[in-house]
Amino acid sequence: MSENKTRVDNAATGDIKHQGKDIFFAAVETTRMPMIVTDPNRPDNPIIFANRAFLEMTGYASEEIIGSNCRFLQGPDTDRTAVQSIRDAIDQRVDISTEILNYRKDGSSFWNALFISPVYNDAGELIYFFASQLDISRRRDAEEALRQAQKMEALGQLTGGIAHDFNNLLQVMGGYIDLIGSAAEKPVIDVQRVQRSVHHAKSAVERASTLTKQLLAFARKQKLQGRVLNLNGLVSTTEPLIERTFGPEVIIETDLDPALKNCRIDPTQAEVALLNIFINARDALIGRLNPKIFIETRNLVVDELANMSYDGLLPGRYVSIAVTDNGIGMPASIRDRVMDPFFTTKEEGKGSGLGLSMVYGFAKQSGGAARIYTEEGVGTTLRLYFPVDEAVLSKNDPPKASERRIGSSERILIVEDRPDVAELAKMVLDDYGYVSEIVLNAREALKRFEAGATYDLLFTDLIMPGGMNGVMLAREVRRRFPKVKVLLTTGYAESSIERTDIGGSEFEVVSKPCMPQDLARKVRQVLDGPNGIA
């Protein structure tokens, strides 16, 4: 035993030229797996041995790397977090297994499955670090190709679903608008027929708007109006909704943690998310004996070791709400797809397939997660997690919105690159008593201000061509003409607008599409605000 210890100790000094009979180094040399040995007792933990497989994998000669630290394998795209985890493991003298992007001598990159382990002698002294490696580039490339294929499949499903739903809505809108146009040409107008057509066209617009918001929520682009609330209170306020959704034949049980912490989420989107969960649970209970729903809330602490068990939630404190049904459940083949957009097992017309994807997007954008547990024939649990908010829940009633007032001939400059959209906004604002003008780009708007035209409000689209978008225009107008109030509008995503240090929007925003009364109300709020922020 002492003879073996001497051989190992000698090798640890770096004098390995005469260690050919050493079983350890002979095994390392002859294996087909790339391996190196480093000496932690020397400065910078240099390589003291590299086998032939390692040299072939990296393209280096032995004399080029012996005595060097392994960092020469790193390159511009090497993950610095992975590098730091390796350094930490070496400092702590523990095993580590990771995958990292490394570089060969010729500059080409490869994915390296790396395993590092400390080696001790009989006296318990650290003498080596032993590192085995494997080029797994083909596997990683195959995984990336699979992910890309899955993305394309999902994109195809998404675009197909969008086209299907929007074509139906456009058919409704276009058809009823044509009917209104035909009615206007007749000598005697059937008022009831026109009113019915207007009602159906407006309903289609509202459904299209809801569909867009659900898509943006899935993509985590929809702006959420977060405020501090308690999930127990949310359950209480939605009790009538729950009862209407399930009916008297379904038993509803709750277990609400009385010490539940608060969270900051959008209450409207939260209610919509719960409604989608309830609807799916209701459909799963059809035909089941003793149908039952169980709603539970609880506090949760996620640490660094457990975060992957919660879909990568950041370590911290969370609250959760779970809805469990004893319905039909789902097979494993469906479980992993139920939160994909437009994926549905329901019949045509019974669901768009956006409900649970909207739930997923809402939870993610709120800093949380959505998880589903299901067993075919047994039931399903859908649980949402949200970060705890330490702010004190306000006991005051929410402030009421400003009362609607007709405009008093305030002058409004409309900046919109779509003439039809701009003309509609002008008609609406003029009908409400404002005096509005239209320009089609930001440069023209600035020219109006520079020429001495006076306006009380700048109403500008967010996304415009020409090198200056709505935010840039708004900032320039506010800088040069500080008395002018600003209101932005967008049909894309309010998350494109930068946030202030206090967490609010830099400018007030109204989303497209919006009803005329909503636009007029928002304009009134901004005009009444002290600095353009209601």
Curated annotation (Swiss-Prot):
Residues 411-527 form the Response regulatory domain. InterPro entries: CheY-like_superfamily (IPR011006), HATPase_C_sf (IPR036890), His_kinase_dom (IPR005467), HisK_dim/P_dom (IPR003661), HisK_dim/P_sf (IPR036097), PAC (IPR001610), PAS (IPR000014), PAS-assoc_C (IPR000700). Residues 94-148 form the PAC domain. Its EC number is 2.7.13.3. SUPFAM superfamilies: ATPase domain of HSP90 chaperone/DNA topoisomerase II/histidine kinase (SSF55874), CheY-like (SSF52172), Homodimeric domain of signal transducing histidine kinase (SSF47384), PYP-like sensor domain (PAS domain) (SSF55785). The modification Phosphohistidine is found at H164. FMN binds covalently to cysteine after exposure to blue light and this bond is spontaneously broken in the dark. This is Blue-light-activated protein. Photosensitive kinase and response regulator that is involved in increased bacterial virulence upon exposure to light. The modification 4-aspartylphosphate is found at D461. Residues 20-93 form the PAS domain. It catalyses: ATP + protein L-histidine = ADP + protein N-phospho-L-histidine. Disulfide bonds: none annotated. It is an enzyme of class 2 (transferase). Keywords: ATP-binding, Chromophore, Flavoprotein, FMN, Kinase, Nucleotide-binding, Phosphoprotein, Photoreceptor protein, Receptor, Sensory transduction, Transferase, Virulence. Pfam families: HATPase_c, PAS_9, Response_reg. Residues 161-390 form the Histidine kinase domain. The modification S-4a-FMN cysteine is found at C70. One of its GO terms (molecular function) is ATP binding.
